[in-house]
Amino acid sequence: MSDKIQELVDKTFTLSKDYKHHYVTIEHLLAIILDTDEVIDILAEMQIDPKDCSRDVYDHLEKEVDAYTDDEIQPKKTVMLERVFHRAFTQALFNGRQNLDTRDLLISILSEDTTPAQYIMLSLIHISEPTRQLA
Protein backbone atom coordinates (compact mmCIF):
# COMPACT_ATOMS: atom_id res chain seq x y z
CA MET A 1 0.00 0.00 0.00
CA SER A 2 1.37 3.42 -0.90
CA ASP A 3 2.20 5.96 1.79
CA LYS A 4 -0.63 8.18 0.53
CA ILE A 5 -3.23 5.42 0.88
CA GLN A 6 -1.83 4.35 4.26
CA GLU A 7 -2.20 7.95 5.44
CA LEU A 8 -5.83 7.93 4.30
CA VAL A 9 -6.44 4.64 6.12
CA ASP A 10 -4.91 6.07 9.29
CA LYS A 11 -7.13 9.16 9.00
CA THR A 12 -10.15 6.92 8.47
CA PHE A 13 -9.47 5.02 11.69
CA THR A 14 -8.81 8.29 13.53
CA LEU A 15 -12.12 9.72 12.30
CA SER A 16 -13.98 6.66 13.57
CA LYS A 17 -12.23 6.90 16.92
CA ASP A 18 -12.89 10.66 17.16
CA TYR A 19 -16.59 10.00 16.66
CA LYS A 20 -16.38 7.14 19.18
CA HIS A 21 -17.78 4.66 16.69
CA HIS A 22 -17.48 0.92 17.24
CA TYR A 23 -16.65 0.25 13.62
CA VAL A 24 -14.69 1.81 10.80
CA THR A 25 -17.03 1.87 7.81
CA ILE A 26 -16.89 2.83 4.17
CA GLU A 27 -18.66 6.05 5.13
CA HIS A 28 -15.65 6.97 7.28
CA LEU A 29 -13.38 6.19 4.33
CA LEU A 30 -15.57 8.22 1.97
CA ALA A 31 -15.46 11.19 4.35
CA ILE A 32 -11.67 11.11 4.25
CA ILE A 33 -11.17 10.61 0.51
CA LEU A 34 -13.61 13.42 -0.28
CA ASP A 35 -10.81 15.82 0.65
CA THR A 36 -8.41 14.49 -1.99
CA ASP A 37 -7.88 16.38 -5.24
CA GLU A 38 -8.37 13.25 -7.31
CA VAL A 39 -11.81 12.52 -5.83
CA ILE A 40 -12.83 16.18 -6.03
CA ASP A 41 -12.04 16.08 -9.77
CA ILE A 42 -14.05 12.88 -10.23
CA LEU A 43 -17.01 14.36 -8.37
CA ALA A 44 -16.88 17.43 -10.60
CA GLU A 45 -17.10 15.15 -13.65
CA MET A 46 -20.12 13.47 -12.05
CA GLN A 47 -21.62 16.92 -11.38
CA ILE A 48 -21.55 16.30 -7.62
CA ASP A 49 -20.63 19.18 -5.34
CA PRO A 50 -17.89 17.83 -3.02
CA LYS A 51 -19.05 20.11 -0.20
CA ASP A 52 -22.60 18.75 -0.40
CA CYS A 53 -21.30 15.20 -0.43
CA SER A 54 -18.98 15.82 2.51
CA ARG A 55 -21.77 17.50 4.47
CA ASP A 56 -24.11 14.57 3.88
CA VAL A 57 -21.49 11.97 4.82
CA TYR A 58 -20.57 13.77 8.03
CA ASP A 59 -24.27 14.24 8.84
CA HIS A 60 -24.71 10.49 8.45
CA LEU A 61 -21.73 9.76 10.71
CA GLU A 62 -22.96 12.17 13.37
CA LYS A 63 -26.64 11.26 13.36
CA GLU A 64 -26.97 7.68 12.16
CA VAL A 65 -24.00 5.84 13.65
CA ASP A 66 -24.08 4.94 17.32
CA ALA A 67 -21.23 6.10 19.52
CA TYR A 68 -19.74 4.34 22.52
CA THR A 69 -18.75 5.86 25.85
CA ASP A 70 -15.61 3.87 26.70
CA ASP A 71 -12.49 5.71 25.49
CA GLU A 72 -10.46 2.48 25.57
CA ILE A 73 -12.39 0.81 22.77
CA GLN A 74 -10.56 0.68 19.45
CA PRO A 75 -12.84 0.78 16.40
CA LYS A 76 -12.76 -2.32 14.22
CA LYS A 77 -12.98 -2.37 10.45
CA THR A 78 -16.09 -3.86 8.93
CA VAL A 79 -16.16 -6.73 6.46
CA MET A 80 -17.57 -4.26 3.94
CA LEU A 81 -14.56 -1.97 4.37
CA GLU A 82 -12.25 -4.94 3.79
CA ARG A 83 -14.22 -5.84 0.67
CA VAL A 84 -13.90 -2.26 -0.62
CA PHE A 85 -10.12 -2.42 -0.26
CA HIS A 86 -9.88 -5.86 -1.88
CA ARG A 87 -12.02 -4.75 -4.81
CA ALA A 88 -10.01 -1.53 -5.19
CA PHE A 89 -6.72 -3.42 -5.15
CA THR A 90 -8.03 -5.85 -7.76
CA GLN A 91 -9.10 -2.86 -9.88
CA ALA A 92 -5.59 -1.42 -9.63
CA LEU A 93 -3.99 -4.75 -10.61
CA PHE A 94 -6.29 -5.12 -13.62
CA ASN A 95 -5.17 -1.66 -14.71
CA GLY A 96 -1.51 -2.69 -14.48
CA ARG A 97 -0.74 -0.82 -11.26
CA GLN A 98 0.75 -2.22 -8.09
CA ASN A 99 -0.73 0.42 -5.78
CA LEU A 100 -4.19 1.71 -5.04
CA ASP A 101 -5.22 5.27 -5.61
CA THR A 102 -8.23 7.17 -4.36
CA ARG A 103 -10.02 6.66 -7.68
CA ASP A 104 -9.96 2.89 -7.10
CA LEU A 105 -11.36 3.37 -3.61
CA LEU A 106 -14.16 5.64 -4.81
CA ILE A 107 -15.18 3.21 -7.57
CA SER A 108 -15.16 0.38 -5.07
CA ILE A 109 -17.28 2.34 -2.58
CA LEU A 110 -19.82 3.06 -5.32
CA SER A 111 -19.89 -0.66 -6.14
CA GLU A 112 -21.19 -1.55 -2.67
CA ASP A 113 -24.95 -1.91 -3.01
CA THR A 114 -27.44 -0.54 -0.50
CA THR A 115 -24.98 1.41 1.62
CA PRO A 116 -25.35 4.92 2.99
CA ALA A 117 -22.19 5.91 1.10
CA GLN A 118 -23.62 4.78 -2.23
CA TYR A 119 -27.00 6.35 -1.47
CA ILE A 120 -25.43 9.70 -0.59
CA MET A 121 -23.30 9.75 -3.73
CA LEU A 122 -26.10 8.72 -6.07
CA SER A 123 -28.59 11.13 -4.52
CA LEU A 124 -26.30 14.05 -5.36
CA ILE A 125 -25.79 13.29 -9.04
CA HIS A 126 -27.42 16.02 -11.07
CA ILE A 127 -29.02 14.40 -14.07
CA SER A 128 -30.09 16.89 -16.65
CA GLU A 129 -33.18 16.13 -18.67
CA PRO A 130 -32.50 15.13 -22.25
CA THR A 131 -33.24 17.84 -24.73
CA ARG A 132 -36.25 17.15 -26.86
CA GLN A 133 -36.22 17.92 -30.51
CA LEU A 134 -39.22 19.74 -31.79
CA ALA A 135 -40.75 18.22 -34.88
Residue ranges of each PLM-predicted region?
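Chalcogenol-based redox active-site neighborhoods
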Residues: A135
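Histone-fold recognition with a strong bias for associated Lys/Arg-rich disordered tails
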Residues: M1-S128, R132
